[in-house]
């Protein structure tokens, strides 16, 4: 968590309007392949000094610790190989990609749609 809390804070809450939360939110991204890829491609993850294995382990821990209720029923943990293949192509515009992914997911996930409405 040391590598994430500088922006997302120790309790994974983020900064409203500036840094998105991990807590009770990040698990939604795993409901689509684009969202899953995004979590590894964001610059803070893809450009981290952590190894591929460490990133996979950290992401799996973060998701299961801070956003378990939002994970898909058939959650598949990140693997070292998956992280290695995704982090070579960092997301150039994380804010735009995040908005697009969440808007697409909101059509399928009523709970996410309600959260997005309440937070906008």
Residue ranges and their predicted role:
Residues 13-48:
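Gly/Gly-Pro-rich "capping" loops immediately C-terminal to redox-active cysteine motifs
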Residues 49-59:
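Mature extracytoplasmic domains of secretory-pathway proteins
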Residues 10, 25, 38-45, 61-65, ...:
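Structured segments of extracytoplasmic/periplasmic soluble domains
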Residues 31-38, 54-55, 79-82:
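Stable alpha-helical elements in mature extracytoplasmic
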Residues 7-9, 28, 70-72:
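A short, ordered amphipathic alpha-helix with a cationic face
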Residues 1-10, 58, 62:
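The canonical Cys-X-X-Cys-His
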Residues 53, 64-120:
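Flexible coil segments in periplasmic/lumen-exposed cytochrome c-class electron-transfer proteins
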